A protein has these predicted regions:
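Proline-centric
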Residues: 1, 49, 148-155, 187-202
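Specificity-determining recognition surfaces
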Residues: 70, 163-193
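Amphipathic alpha-helical segments with low aromatic content
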Residues: 1-54, 199-229
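A short beta-sheet element
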Residues: 80-81, 86-88, 97-165, 184
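Short beta-strand/turn micro-motifs at beta-sheet edges
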Residues: 32, 133-136, 176-181
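Structural detector for helix-capping/boundary residues
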Residues: 44, 56-59, 88, 106, ...
Length: 229
């Protein structure tokens, strides 16, 4: 039995190391990509990326949409079919498919919550714990703890999600100047990003999606092995 548990512990350690290594690879690629583009230097290590990028405000690339909460005292507003997210539901997963709580059409219409379109929306938490992100895979709404990024038709959501670390860092710097750590939709829309053409956006988004899938795979294996133990 002792030998069996030793094998399981070794498997856990192995997948933890793999997960950490892949996360470091992702972080390093992002930094290298941004530095290469911003310095306008060709980098043979990243042949995927050109230097033909331009500076754009996030608000030019997407609509920034806030959320709201229907009155909790009215049962007609709750337990419906409309996804309604809170920041606590956003973790490290690249995609989200369904929320813990649902609201009704009546609840939606009697609050400042709005329907956000699937596949084009990146949820972005805007209060303490700023910058947790996820791509919607089903239409949804959120509470007021978000400033969601709904990308325009010529912008790839996978690419914008891949830039979320950079967006988060800039958003935190903006929020640090306020009494309560929060970023408004107007402030978020003013954040500057470097962006390539749509085809290159798609290639970059696909690359980082593959990396995130690898991270998720090892995290799932860790969960299963720990559960078996």
């Amino acid at each position: 039995i002792g030998e069996l548990f030793s094998i399981i512990d070794n498997l856990i350690t192995l997948h933890q190391r793999k997960s950490v290594t892949i996360k470091k690879l992702k972080s390093g690629l992002l930094r290298k990509m941004i530095l290469t583009v911003e310095s306008t230097l060709t980098d043979v290590f990243l042949p995927l990326f050109t230097i033909d990028w331009e500076q754009r405000k996030l608000g030019e690339l997407a609509e920034i949409v806030s959320g709201g909460t229907p009155a909790t005292s009215n049962p007609e507003y709750w337990d419906g079919t409309i996804n309604w997210y809170t920041p606590a539901e956003i973790s490290e997963a690249r995609y989200v498919y369904g929320s813990q709580k649902k609201i009704t059409e009546v609840g939606l219409n009697n609050s400042s919550a709005k329907i956000l379109p699937k596949d084009r929306t990146i949820l972005f938490t805007s209060r303490a714990g700023i910058g947790k992100t996820a791509i919607l895979k089903n239409d949804a709404s959120t509470n007021q703890g978000f400033q969601s990024i709904v990308v325009k038709n010529n912008i790839d959501p996978e690419f914008v999600y891949s830039m979320s670390t950079q967006i988060k860092e800039k958003a935190e710097r903006v929020a640090a100047g306020s009494t309560f750590s929060e970023i408004s939709g107007k402030q978020l829309g003013k954040i500057i990003l470097m962006i390539p053409g749509i085809k290159e956006q798609q290639r970059i988004g696909e690359l980082f999606s593959i990396i995130d899938n690898l991270i998720t795979l090892h995290q799932r294996k860790l969960f299963i092995i720990a559960y078996i133990k």
